[in-house]
């Protein structure tokens, strides 16, 4: 349970997000069956969120906080750190495990 991180390509290994910092990422979100439900890459616009402000689901934040600058990783988020039993009607089914391909582009 929780978030599992699998490195796709390593980052600098030194610069990690700190609480209150803004993470600038590109991501693609998929269901376990591979169905894409969202992607900042498709919009060609990086996504920004602040660490520690609950602006994203828990698993996404926990995973990104462990990534170093420039790293690209696959985050597998179990329902307890995603949308849980409720899901997100019309997009995420109840009790769904979500997979994100996340690249940490910058910290502000």
UniProtKB/Swiss-Prot annotation:
GO terms for molecular function: calcium channel inhibitor activity; calcium channel regulator activity; FK506 binding; peptidyl-prolyl cis-trans isomerase activity; signaling receptor binding; transmembrane transporter binding. Transmembrane segments: none annotated. The keyword Cytoplasm applies. Inhibited by both FK506 and rapamycin. It catalyses: [protein]-peptidylproline (omega=180) = [protein]-peptidylproline (omega=0). Keywords: Cytoplasm, Isomerase, Rotamase, Sarcoplasmic reticulum. It is found in: Cytoplasm; Sarcoplasmic reticulum. One of its GO terms (cellular component) is calcium channel complex. Detected in heart muscle (at protein level). Isoform 1 and isoform 2 are ubiquitous with highest levels in brain and thymus. Its EC number is 5.2.1.8. Residues 20-108 form the PPIase FKBP-type domain. Pfam families: FKBP_C. One of its GO terms (biological process) is negative regulation of insulin secretion involved in cellular response to glucose stimulus. The keyword Magnesium does not apply. PANTHER family: PEPTIDYL-PROLYL CIS-TRANS ISOMERASE, PEPTIDYL-PROLYL CIS-TRANS ISOMERASE FKBP1B. Identified in a complex composed of RYR2, FKBP1B, PKA catalytic subunit, PRKAR2A, AKAP6, and the protein phosphatases PP2A and PP1. Interacts directly with RYR2. Has the potential to contribute to the immunosuppressive and toxic effects of FK506 and rapamycin. PPIases accelerate the folding of proteins. It catalyzes the cis-trans isomerization of proline imidic peptide bonds in oligopeptides. Belongs to the FKBP-type PPIase family. FKBP1 subfamily. This is Peptidyl-prolyl cis-trans isomerase FKBP1B.
């Amino acid at each position: 349970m929780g978030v599992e991180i699998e490195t796709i390509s390593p980052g600098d290994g030194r610069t990690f997000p700190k609480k209150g910092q803004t993470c600038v990422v590109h991501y693609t979100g998929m269901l376990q069956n591979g169905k894409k439900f969202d992607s900042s890459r498709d919009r060609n616009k990086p996504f920004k969120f602040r660490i520690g402000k609950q602006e994203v689901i828990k698993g996404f934040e926990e995973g990104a906080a462990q990534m170093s600058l420039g790293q690209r990783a696959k985050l597998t988020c179990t329902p307890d750190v995603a949308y849980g039993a409720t899901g997100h009607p019309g997009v995420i089914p109840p009790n769904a495990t979500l997979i994100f391909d996340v690249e940490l582009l910058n910290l502000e």
